[in-house]
């Protein structure tokens, strides 16, 4: 089964949340009393359990539970994330289901978190059948961990299951090759310039990029 290839710990919620799914968000503050997040053994895409969100107030703009940056990743590498989601028939027409993905350095504190944004397709309204949400992420040059966090808004009952995170083979090398080719072209153009200061500045950016990845050029150019 593909779930056994998932890099996530507890991808099908067959075990307790403790130590695997612990990063809960309730927005705005104060809506927690009308919401709940729990494992559910009455609804499942595969196995016995799923993750169940109940949202009882329309004031909610986000309820979510994430892995809290426990999944180790390689820098400059592509990963695919897929999950299955469904809702109760009574779920509001305005309800939305999406996936938040974040990256961080070695120490997962707020000062180290970046690229913590919604990724992939968004489901809107009731979803009577299990429906896939899929996203890809290309990790930054200094990324070490990711957070996977299914999120909802609107009232109703929402279930998640079968969350798969896998590396996309070969894509990182292909992207690196393309970036290096572009940098080589820039290097050649820089070498043809006559103005020493301008030439040196661009040459320095190119060399930095080759050593540290394309993000170094973006940062140095800002």
Describe these PLM feature segments:
Residues 82-84, 147-151:
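Extracellular recognition modules
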Residues 44-46, 74-76, 90, 125-130, ...:
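Surface-exposed coil/turn segments at beta-strand junctions on protein surfaces, enriched
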Residues 106-143, 158:
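Extracellular carbohydrate recognition and processing domains
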Residues 23-25, 61-67, 90-104, 145-148:
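Beta-strand acidic-aromatic groove motif in beta-rich domains, primarily in extracellular
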Residues 11-17, 51, 55-57, 61-96, ...:
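Extra-cytoplasmic beta-strand recognition segments
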Residues 13-53:
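Extracellular glycan-recognition surfaces and repeat-rich motifs
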Residues 129, 142, 151-167:
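Extracellular carbohydrate recognition
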Residues 1-6, 170-222:
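Beta-rich interaction/scaffold domains
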């Amino acid at each position: 089964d593909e779930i056994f290839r998932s890099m996530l710990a507890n991808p099908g919620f067959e075990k307790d949340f403790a130590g695997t799914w612990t990063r809960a968000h309730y927005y705005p503050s104060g809506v927690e009393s009308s919401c709940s997040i729990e494992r559910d053994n009455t609804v499942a895409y595969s196995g016995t359990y799923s993750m169940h969100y109940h949202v009882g107030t329309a004031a909610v703009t986000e309820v979510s539970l994430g892995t809290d940056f426990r999944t180790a990743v390689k820098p400059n590498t592509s990963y695919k994330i897929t999950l299955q989601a469904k809702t109760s028939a009574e779920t509001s027409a305005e309800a939305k289901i999406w996936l938040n993905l974040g990256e961080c350095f070695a120490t997962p504190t707020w000062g180290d978190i970046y690229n913590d944004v919604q990724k992939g397709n968004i489901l809107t309204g009731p979803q009577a059948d299990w429906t896939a949400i899929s996203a890809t992420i290309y990790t930054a040059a200094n990324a070490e961990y990711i957070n996977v966090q299914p999120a909802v808004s609107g009232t109703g009952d929402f279930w998640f299951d079968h969350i798969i995170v896998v590396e996309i083979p070969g894509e990182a090398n292909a992207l690196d090759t393309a970036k290096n080719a572009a940098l080589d072209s820039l290097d050649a153009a820089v070498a043809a310039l006559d103005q020493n200061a301008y030439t040196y500045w661009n040459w320095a950016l190119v060399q930095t990029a080759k050593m540290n990845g394309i993000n170094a050029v973006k940062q140095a150019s800002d």
